[in-house]
Amino acid sequence: MKAYAMLKIGATGWIEKPRPVCGPNDAIIRPLAVAPCTSDVHTVWEGGIGERHNMVLGHEGCGVVDEVGSEVKSFKVGDRVLVAAITPEWNSVNAQAGYPMHSGGMLGGWKFSNVKDGMFAEYFHVNDAEGNLALMPEGMDLADACMLSDMIPTGFHANELADIQYGVALSFFCAGPVGLMAIAGAALKGAGRIIVVDSRPDIVEIAKAYGATDYIDFKKVSVVDEILKWTNNEGVEKVLISGGGSTILETAIKVLRPGGKIGNVNYFGAGEFLTIPRVEWGVGMAHKAIHGGLMLGGRLRLEKLARLIMTKKLDPSKMITHRFKGFEHIEEALFLMKDKPKDLIKSVVIF
C-alpha cells in the first residue's frame, strides 16, 4: 500500500508498505480524512522521540472499517468510525489504575507514528478496537471528525489537568488548534476570564469566538508584567499550555498565583531539560502545581466529545483554515504545519 512516512530525522517521503495485519481484537481502517499535526513536525524535524526509519506518519483521522478481528463485536466492515490519536490497551494495569494513556509504560498509549505506523496510508491498524473506536454520528463533517482524534481531546485535557472551575481567571499560552480547543473547553467549564497569550492578531477573533476575553501579544509586551498588572499583582489561578518552547514553563510559573495549577499538554520536542524559576516557585514551596499529561483516548471520550459537536455546543470548523481533496495532498498539508504561514491554523486532507 502507498503511505507517507518519516524516512529519518529531517526527511519524509512516499513509500510502499505491506497492508497491516488484523489481530483478533483489532481493526483495519481505510481513512476517509486525515490531518497533519505539529507533533508530526516535532517528531520529524526536531527528532522529538528519536530516530525512526520509514515510519508512517499521522495520528489524526477518521475512516471506514475494512476488517475486524474475531473478538470485535461492536463494529463491522463498512462502519464509519472515529479514532483517537491515543489508543491504549484497556485491559492493562495502568488503565485499571486510571492512566490508560500510559498502558505498557510512559506514553504507551501513543502508538500511531511513534511505536507503529500511523494513519497517512491507504490502511491503518487500530489495536483494542472495542475500546479505541467510536461510531461516527450520521451527518458529521469529516474534517470535524478528524479534530476529535487529537485537537479537541488534548485541548480539553489541559482543562482537566488544571482543574478549571466556574469563574476562575486563567492565562492560556499558544492559541494554535489545540489551544483554541483548550479555550473552548475552559469556556464550557465556566472560566470567568481567559487571557490568551500569542503573537498572531489574526487568531484573536477566532479565540474570542471560542471564549477568550483578553489577548496579549508576547512579541510586543512583557507577558509577566501585563498579567500581573491585570490581576493586581496576584497572578492567575490557572495556566494552560499547548505550545511554545522550553522557556514557556518559566513564564507560566511567574504569572501563576500561589495555590494555582498549570495544565500542560505541550509536546516539548527539543532540549534535555525544562527549567523552573526558583524564586517565583516559592523556593519550592509556593503550592504552584505543574500537571502535564497525555490525553486518555478511548471510545467513551470520543462519543462524549462528538455529542458536543452534534448538539452545536462546539464548532471545530472555525479553526480549519486549509482543506485539501485527495490523498496525494498529505505532503502539502504537512509542510503547511511545518512552515506555519500566517493564515494557517489547521489543515485537513479529505480523501
Swiss-Prot record:
Catalytic activity: propan-2-ol + NADP(+) = acetone + NADPH + H(+)
Uppermost EC category: oxidoreductase
Entries under PROSITE patterns matching the protein: ADH_ZINC
Positions contributing to NADP(+) binding: 175-178, 198-200, 265-267, 340
Entry note: cofactor: Binds 1 zinc ion per subunit.
Required cofactor names: Zn(2+)
Pfam families from the UniProt entry: ADH_N, ADH_zinc_N
Stored InterPro entries: ADH-like_C, ADH-like_N, ADH_Zn_CS, GroES-like_sf, NAD(P)-bd_dom_sf, PKS_ER
Keywords assigned: Metal-binding, NADP, Oxidoreductase, Zinc
Family under the similarity heading: Belongs to the zinc-containing alcohol dehydrogenase family.
Protein name: Probable NADP-dependent isopropanol dehydrogenase
Gene that specifies this protein: adh
